[in-house]
Amino acid sequence: MALVDVLDFIPENHPKRKELIKIIQDLADTLPKYQDKTGLWYQVLDKPNYRGNYLEASVSSMFMYGYAKAVSKGYLDKKYMSIAEKAYNGIMEHLIVKNPDGTLTLTKCCAVAGLGGHPYRDGSVEYYINERIRDNDSKATGPFIMGCLYLRR
């Protein structure tokens, strides 16, 4: 997502621009291997069967947005839009809750995760799957909304 966004500010003739687009293309080929059948991605991508790992909203929203925008900008072939669509459908089916007042809630957002500080944030699977989960975190809702715009939803 961030790499796709930053290309908006890198001139077309920049000598490293093609390298950045190649990174996006390589990621686009790799990430579907970790996409769950629901269309979502796990908090720890490569450990889907790890006890306590869960299908997470911010990563799924960020990847949905990244794919949709990269296709729209021409960095990826149109065939990759189906990955964004699958993610959108998964988010709508499994992570969006319609509230009694008509508003929507995006669930299963990791509140925060990162590295650094001893012994906290050690980068272990246990650390990542045990971080607090919250609803409507902006790092999930923002990419979800942006992805919806690129998907024309």
List each language-model region with its residue ranges.
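Oxyanion-binding "anion nests"
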Residues: A2-P48, G52
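Hydrophobic core segments within long, regular secondary-structure runs in both alpha-
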Residues: V4-L7, K18-P32, M64, A68, ...
